[in-house]
C-alpha cells in the first residue's frame, strides 16, 4: 500500500447561498461554510491523520476551507500549493447569474443540460469533461507522485473539479458521475496502492447531505 489522498469540497459560499452560478468567480465562505470546513477538519483530526502537503485551488473559498482543515489537525503552517488547475468548472456566460434567472432566459431543459450533461458546456464555459481535462493531468504530474511516495496529501477544491477526480478513482461511468454530488466539508479518504489504484475509500461524514 502506498500513501493517502484526502479530498474535501469547500464549505458553502456566499453565492451558493444566493443560488448563483459561481465557477471561477471568487466569493468567500458563509458562516455555515466555515462551520462545514471546521467540521471536516475535526473529522480528520479524530481520524488521526497528519498531512505532508496540501493542494488547493486559486479561489478563496477552497483556500479558506483548506486552511480551516489544517488548523483543525494542528498543521496551520503546512506547505500548501495553490493552482488554478483545481478551480471549479468555469460556467462561462452563466457565471454570476441566479439559477432561476438562467432558466427563465434559456429554458429549464437547456440549463439542465448545461449543468448535468458530461460533455455539453454552457456558452463560454466548460463541461465536466473539459474540467477533468485540466484537473486529471495536474493530479498525475503534481499530486499522485506525492501519494505514491507514501505521503498523506490533502486536496481542498470544488464540487466539479473533485467529481472529475472521483470519476476516475472510483471507476465511474459518465452516467454515474452525473448522479454523484459531493457534500460540502465532508472528507473522502483514499488509500492508494503502489500502482495508483484505490485500495480503500472512507467517507468521514454524511455524503447524503450533498446538493
Curated annotation (Swiss-Prot):
Substrate binds at residues 9-16, 22-23, 61, 88-91, 99, 115-116, 159-160. One of its GO terms (molecular function) is phosphoglycerate mutase activity. The record marks 158 as: Transition state stabilizer. Pathway: Carbohydrate degradation; glycolysis; pyruvate from D-glyceraldehyde 3-phosphate: step 3/5. Keywords: Gluconeogenesis, Glycolysis, Isomerase. GO terms for biological process: gluconeogenesis; glycolytic process. It holds the Pfam family His_Phos_1. Gene3D superfamilies: Phosphoglycerate mutase-like (3.40.50.1240). The active site is at 10 (tele-phosphohistidine intermediate), 88 (proton donor/acceptor). Belongs to the phosphoglycerate mutase family. BPG-dependent PGAM subfamily. This is 2,3-bisphosphoglycerate-dependent phosphoglycerate mutase. The gene is gpmA.
